[in-house]
């Protein structure tokens, strides 16, 4: 199954909406509008954790995070490639979507605190106790609708100068606006 939701940020209009590949066929699962159905979040929540920890000063982009085998009460997360990188800068861990640094960060930040932040950003389906999700929340252990996830990212994008990706150094970046729960400097 596949779904696509594209929103034009300036106009706040839905540009493309495809709830499933062949929505009207009789093939199993094709009658589900995946945009409105809660699905595993996978790794899409990682940027929100990084932003929250930047805001509180727990990490900086170049903070080294451990990417080594861990076992937390029987929970042994692994990276997608089943390899370990040792010490990795936070910005690289996020860019590469490394699981182990993210789990360690969530452990430090707090699951309940992170869940509350996600709810503030509009993820309405994360309504069970934080203990239900555990550390797997950051790896897809929770569910959200594509509407909610898209709107949360939209809030983030609305407050970042889109041309910053074309600039050469952080010193040249200009952040505009304010993200709910984040200051301008953290939303970068």
Could you describe each region identified by the protein language model?
Residues 9, 24-25, 54-63, 124-127, ...:
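Secondary-structure transition/capping motifs at alpha-helix termini
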Residues 1-39, 43-44, 60, 112-118:
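Periplasmic/cell-envelope proteins involved in peptidoglycan metabolism and beta-lactam response
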Residues 12, 33-65, 93, 152-157:
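Active-site SXXK
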Residues 123-182:
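Active-site-proximal helix/loop microenvironment
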Residues 109-128:
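Short, charged, amphipathic alpha-helices and their helix-cap/turn boundaries
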Residues 59-114, 158, 162, 177-188:
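Conserved catalytic neighborhood of penicillin-recognizing serine enzymes
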Residues 1-4, 11-15, 76, 89-91, ...:
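Short glycine-rich loop/turn motifs
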Residues 30-35, 86-87, 95-102, 131-138:
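Flexible glycine/proline-enriched surface loops and loop-helix/loop-strand junctions
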